[in-house]
Amino acid sequence: MGYIKFQKDRKFEIVPIGRVAIDFNPTDINRPLSKSMTFKKYLGGSPANIAVGLSRLGKKVGFIGKVSKDQFGKFVVDYFNNEGIDTSQIKYAENGESLGLTFTEIASPTESSILMYRNGIADLELDVNEIDEEYIKNTKAIVISGTALAKSPSREAALKALELAKKNDTVVIFDVDYREYNWKNKDEIAIYYSIVGKQSDIVMGSREEFDLMESLIVKEKSTDEESAKRWLGFGNKIVVIKHGKEGSTAYTNDGKSYKIKPFPVKLLKSFGGGDAYASAFIYGILEEWDIMDALEFGSASAAMLVASHSCSEDMPTVKEINEFIKEKKEQYGEMIARG
């Protein structure tokens, strides 16, 4: 493929940075959250889900973050260890900060919402002194989550990781991952998103997330093509713009674009697909696949997740994704997602 050059012989292939949380998904679904009485606990947070997804796909994964110094923090570290994810750079909060909690609502397969508790949380207390240059130097790529930029000191820690990655030829993947919690205003969002977006190698986000990132750059909202040209012009090699059920498009720095559609599945929920998409797409990039193959792999993984109850726990393996793609193509035709 040749768009991204990864350094060889590094200990880790990918290291996400930022949010890790606990998801509580209702087991009594198809009703509003206020009516749900029973929930199942899962590991959550986009960077954490991406880490699990890539580890399930066979990659050597590390993680940089901070968790609560309690049973929930122990749950995260134990879960990562069981998944084969390195936890040496996961720090414990020392001042009573909690792990972020997310309660999800599955009112119907197409009506889902998320209630987050994000005040006084551990992941936003990650400090610049807790970012180890050797760790950044020893991975092929880092994933910076936009939520890590929402508040200090996590904001500065993420920016330090960005600078160290650029210094050490470590690829930077920016997953915009917008959550309204903790941000003061939209100007603040645009400023910090742009700082990372202008220095990353791959930037991934929804149309709405690109609009937020560009709100101080342009007078009117951009088209996908205009946004892609802008961020490729800043030095990104790949720009991925997602439109949910309408599919997504990857734009590359040689002027090409590649569009993928979702695979048809019976929806259980309308959240969680983005993290599966990101992990599987990044897997394809690490494997130096053609862009369309990486997009198809990501789209398939996303479809599998929105048909499942959890995010992290249901992340598929390479074999499972390939079997899913094969089954769907036999059922609907070779070009089902590529049309």
From Swiss-Prot:
Q: Name one GO molecular function term.
A: 5-dehydro-2-deoxygluconokinase activity
Its EC number(s) = 2.7.1.92
| Tagged with keyword Iron-sulfur | no
Q: Report the domain of life of the source organism.
A: Bacteria
Q: Does the keyword Kinase apply?
A: yes
UniProt GO BP: inositol catabolic process
Keywords of this entry: ATP-binding, Kinase, Nucleotide-binding, Transferase
UniProt-listed InterPro entries: Carboh/pur_kinase_PfkB_CS, DKG_kinase_firmi, Myo_inos_IolC, Myo_inos_IolC-like_sf, PfkB_Carbo_kinase, PfkB_dom, Ribokinase-like
Instruction: Name the chemical reaction catalysed here.
Output: 5-dehydro-2-deoxy-D-gluconate + ATP = 6-phospho-5-dehydro-2-deoxy-D-gluconate + ADP + H(+)
Enzyme class, UniProt record, top EC level: transferase
Pfam families reported for this sequence: PfkB (PF00294)
Can you tell me which residues the record assigns to a coiled coil? none
Q: In which pathway does it act?
A: Polyol metabolism; myo-inositol degradation into acetyl-CoA; acetyl-CoA from myo-inositol: step 5/7
What does this protein's UniProt record list under function? Answer: Catalyzes the phosphorylation of 5-dehydro-2-deoxy-D-gluconate (2-deoxy-5-keto-D-gluconate or DKG) to 6-phospho-5-dehydro-2-deoxy-D-gluconate (DKGP).
Q: Which family does it belong to?
A: Belongs to the carbohydrate kinase PfkB family.
Record-linked PANTHER family: 5-DEHYDRO-2-DEOXYGLUCONOKINASE, HEXOKINASE FAMILY MEMBER
- Protein name per its UniProtKB record: 5-dehydro-2-deoxygluconokinase
Q: Which organism is it from?
A: Clostridium botulinum (strain Alaska E43 / Type E3)
